[in-house]
Amino acid sequence: FQKMVYTTYINILWKRGINMRDKDCIFCKIAAGEIPSATLYEDDDFRVILDLGPASKGHALILPKEHFRNLYDIDDELAAKAMVLAKKMVKKLTDVLGCDGYNIVQNNEECAGQTVFHFHMHLIPRYKGDQVGLEWKVGELTDEVRDEILEKMK
């Protein structure tokens, strides 16, 4: 019952635009230093750690210390800081690892592959010939679909 009340309270705060740490969120605990991690970088807003289930050597995660469910919830200033931090980390990791490229991945909601509901960014080093699969079938943008989307976006 207490967990249900706490979760309801957090949801009400989120709807009001007030974010706070979720006591049951594994990434909140890691970001706060309550759970040990291989920390590559830390500041007042973020912790960057090595992923325990890496897609490739050097796969890292950027975790904000404040709890946001996903990109829809994070405030603009912190989202911008996350991207600047991603750039900084990718440059440093490329120098250290000698990788050939990078994927920066950020999933939102279960259907898009989000498994931990705390905003985070994956920094995935890529190496020539690696078997990391981040591809999708290329479709075709028809005139009808293009026009429909453009109209709805006005």
Where are these regions (language model features)?
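Charged/polar low-complexity intrinsically disordered segments
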Residues: Q2-K3
